[in-house]
């Protein structure tokens, strides 16, 4: 991964043309995939996404981000995927955020933690259609998980002064019976 990170840094140079930068993307990805430790690969995804965000020219940057999303999806469910999603959520294009959201909810056992940074990035776009799209997905989860995710969405929407109708809090009310007591308590403390 160190090679991948170094190559990615070189791609930020204005002296490199876009075609060369685009040719290096698969080399960078191959170098990343040589890493066997999931936590280190997740860390590298963050470093490379930050560096690629500084590349001049959009074509190679878009290809790199697309590959980073694929590498993130290839990580095993767990803390490494949470870390990768946290580091990449604020750096991908708005159109790719629903894809990251799916990777987060597929991170079994850590869905809520993995979804937080992605939901934050989605709310940050203020794209009401996208927010409505993920909101319907949130309500389809198990009651406990749905309440956790809707609580997070509600908090972020309030912080961003987004007027969602119905609110995420209102959508969570019918799910409270099936949610864990601690989850309900947390929701109530955030609602006040």
Language-model segments: residues:
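Non-catalytic tandem-repeat scaffold regions and their flanking low-complexity/translocation tails
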Residues: 1-192
